[in-house]
Amino acid sequence: MGFASISWKDSVRNVSETGEFVWNLATKELAEQMNRTSLPVPDDVDEFQLAGLTAVPSKHVDVPRVLESRAAMECKVTEIVQFKNWKGEKVEGWLVLGEVVAVYIDTSLIKDGVYQTALATPILRGGDYLEVTQDRMFEMERLPGSSKPAFHGA
């Protein structure tokens, strides 16, 4: 699991100090609260409280997860990489990678043993804010001989 940051913000600083993080699924329902966590606030401000979210203890890492998030992954940091330009020069931006050590998923999002992405109404930022919805999904069969993930009943 990983996330990127355009600068050395609280998230990157915190994971570099603790070696742990929790990835919480941002959804359409939580968009405003999640957006509030990006405000530039002093270190002593509780961003959970600022955003109106509930912090709950994790089981395998010492950082909390967001109770209201319908899916979350507890992670141990494996690598923090500073971005480089095409010349190999370091630029402002970071990629944090971690091994997932625990997963929480709202069971209503699982059908026939498979996580139903669109049911969670996840959002992402890819130049702009985007939402994954059921009407934008499509079916695609894997080609003969292509590898299938072992966790998907390959």
Residue ranges and their predicted role:
Residues 1-154:
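Basic, polyanion-binding surface patches
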